[in-house]
């Protein structure tokens, strides 16, 4: 969220009046927000009051109540970040010469925007989408709405939770949750709120939560819909996680922390408990007739796209009834719904389930209606199949690189060459690799420690997730080393871990997020610089991301914890000869040689992450 404090400075010919502070989070959806219908009584020289405002594109229009007491005034509107940094002045000049209250209207181009990602910085890009929230000295009102354009999401780091399994409202860490029972275990929005310090302590700037809409209530052959993917009514909430007030409170608390909210949604299907022939369509809303769904057929041929899009997922325990998204009425209903969903619950981004099961031309108008960042699940490792979906959605989950990453690091001596090849392939196949969702685990895939218990291999795979191209996504429990395999074992309750903030992987993930966030803070072109491989061999890959002076060099290996100690010499790092760089995981200083080569001390198969010493000063990284 873009958290901004505006203040109105009133400059008089004779004296300077006190500053009147108003706290905003702006959006650009052209909605007029009324603050005061008439001026409030004031004390002292508080003679400027905001009556209404709207942000339309980059134009701020507003009306002010201004009171003059025998001297002219020029009212200038500035903005101030929450950390106290003054942003660009908005060009508003109001000469006032009457001796009473007057309502002045004005319009100005917002010359800048403020993005808060840990540390504040001024961003000259005014094309971003803002959110409105208002806390004035004399009156209070609020309108909670979305913020997250694709450009803003690039710099985020996402912590994914299965809402039911992350944290309970009562804070219990002993409540029993047997994954094989497949029942609701009591995780909630309030539970997440209570644990945001835990999440933010790892450096995350966004969370992704389970689908929020009402699901079928039945105890099916696969248990209950605790995961949220078995829709029944898209206009109602799944109250097992909490009510509307709880969800809004979660969004508000995230936004107060400068964090974003991503919500998982399903468009492709509704669910039924029982045989496909017995589906009761009247139970669904808003599509309460069979006319809105594809005729029954199971998906049997994934090489046939028509079969993939128009036939049904699931089985006769839980058939997933396929919505006919080719119908204009369905398209318009979904577009209207997603706008309302986002506005009602202050959603900043969407993860979209089963994207490849909906015809591709559905997605561009849907994303336009949403108006925020969307990342689609295209469950396929072939970039020639997956990447074209980025023509219609901002991003897709990076399954093409997920499989080579697992292959490279799940065992000693895995295939590094396949990973190198895929990194290069994606640059030509995908429209923008920096908007892909980079992940190692999720609710649909086995946890990485189910493949290996070797901490060095696990650390290398996590480092790739966070420091390569794309928006990093860490699945809840990775920081505690959870090791469940396929569904349902990868959907464990987190609370038995006690939410340790001193575990090996908690501290490790925090360090990686910290250096990434710092590189973005120093120069946000780090985000659009495409990661490239500067060295590889059968056991090692070294990557550079970031322009000269702000580049992170990441060196990964699959030698495992028993790997020997040796020195790897790297060229093409872009580091200046004789400059000092820090390996930020061990806080070791290394001097680049006269030829610009970097001597990398490798040991125990552990990853190495380098950054220029000169850019670390004041960061707190390695006590700098």
UniProtKB/Swiss-Prot annotation:
Family: Belongs to the glycosyl hydrolase 13 family.
GO biological process: one example: carbohydrate catabolic process
Cofactor(s), names only, from the UniProt record: Ca(2+)
Compartment(s) of residence: Secreted
Binding site for Ca(2+) 1: 268, 309, 322, 357
Highest taxon, organism lineage: Eukaryota
Known glycosylation sites: 304, 344
Entry-linked SUPFAM superfamilies: (Trans)glycosidases, Glycosyl hydrolase domain
Catalytic activity, as annotated: Endohydrolysis of (1->4)-alpha-D-glucosidic linkages in polysaccharides containing three or more (1->4)-alpha-linked D-glucose units
Disulphide-bonded residues: 177-185, 297-311, 387-430, 587-622
Gene3D superfamilies cross-referenced by the UniProt entry: Glycosidases, Golgi alpha-mannosidase II
Domain CBM21: 40-133
Protein transport is among the record's keywords: no
EC nos: 3.2.1.1
SMART domains: Aamy
Record: active site: 353, 377
Sequence positions that bind substrate: 230, 269, 351, 356-357, 381, 444, 491
UniProt-recorded Gene Ontology molecular function terms: alpha-amylase activity; calcium ion binding
Name of the protein described by the UniProt record: Alpha-amylase 1
GO cellular component terms listed in the entry, alphabetical order: extracellular region
UniProt KW keywords: Calcium, Carbohydrate metabolism, Disulfide bond, Glycoprotein, Glycosidase, Hydrolase, Metal-binding, Secreted, Signal
Note describing how the cofactor binds: Binds 2 calcium ions per subunit. Calcium is inhibitory at high concentrations.
Gene that encodes the chain: LKA1
Signal peptide positions (record): 1-28
Site (Transition state stabilizer): 444
UniProt-listed InterPro entries: A-amylase-like, A_amylase_C_dom, CBM21_dom, Glyco_hydro_13_cat_dom, Glyco_hydro_b, Glycoside_hydrolase_SF
Keyword flag Metal-binding: yes
